[in-house]
């Protein structure tokens, strides 16, 4: 199997083989994109575990997406807010390079194209700005809710609880 085919299948698996779970499956789907984030600090594509896209109506036609990754050798996952247009275009470019696509992969590409077109047709200066989602979520106990969580126990940490 060609490495690009394996890469595309990885993306398909990252979306759980079904389109529906990839859409709006996160508690806070509308998030601010950190445009000042150093690109070199982004994870390897092979560290990405989940990719989440939103329906256009979810965030009032602001195209934000999220992906979850676990750095190699770490035991916590982190959620990153991303430009939905960029992430959709990247995945579509990878899917277009796969020669023998499974049926689900073709459906995934078709649905991403439909959603991306819907966003593009409703694109305005107002909905191109994600900073309005810059809200700090507070839990019932009054503490700030974070997006980092333990995904497996570490032999060194003992309890498996996050530090702090």
From Swiss-Prot:
Coiled coil: none annotated. One of its GO terms (biological process) is symbiont entry into host cell. Residues 1-24 form the signal peptide. Keywords: Fusion of virus membrane with host cell membrane, Fusion of virus membrane with host membrane, Glycoprotein, Host cell membrane, Host Golgi apparatus, Host membrane, Membrane, Signal, Viral envelope protein, Viral penetration into host cytoplasm, Virion, Virus entry into host cell. It is found in: Virion membrane; Host cell membrane; Host Golgi apparatus, Host trans-Golgi network. Its main location: virion. GO terms for cellular component: host cell Golgi apparatus; host cell plasma membrane; membrane; viral envelope; virion membrane. It is a peripheral membrane protein. The heterodimer glycoprotein H-glycoprotein L is required for the fusion of viral and plasma membranes leading to virus entry into the host cell. Acts as a functional inhibitor of gH and maintains gH in an inhibited form. Upon binding to host integrins, gL dissociates from gH leading to activation of the viral fusion glycoproteins gB and gH. Interacts with glycoprotein H (gH); this interaction is necessary for the correct processing and cell surface expression of gH. The heterodimer gH/gL seems to interact with gB trimers during fusion. Belongs to the herpesviridae glycoprotein L family. This is Envelope glycoprotein L. It comes from Equine herpesvirus 2 (strain 86/87) (EHV-2).
């Amino acid at each position: 199997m060609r490495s690009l085919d394996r890469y595309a299948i990885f993306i398909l698996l990252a979306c759980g083989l079904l389109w529906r779970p990839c859409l709006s499956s996160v508690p806070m789907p509308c998030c601010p994109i950190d445009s000042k984030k150093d690109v070199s600090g982004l994870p390897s594509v092979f560290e990405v575990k989940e990719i989440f896209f939103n329906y256009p109506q979810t965030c009032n036609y602001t195209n934000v997406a999220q992906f979850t990754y676990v750095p190699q050798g770490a035991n916590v996952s982190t959620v990153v807010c991303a430009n939905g247009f960029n992430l959709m275009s990247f995945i579509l470019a990878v899917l277009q390079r796969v020669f023998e696509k499974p049926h689900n992969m073709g459906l995934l590409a078709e649905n991403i194209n439909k959603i991306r077109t819907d966003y593009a047709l409703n694109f305005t200066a107002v909905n191109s700005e994600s900073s309005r989602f810059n809200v700090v979520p507070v839990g019932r106990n009054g503490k700030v809710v974070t997006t980092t969580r333990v995904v497996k126990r570490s032999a060194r940490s003992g309890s498996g609880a996050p530090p702090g």
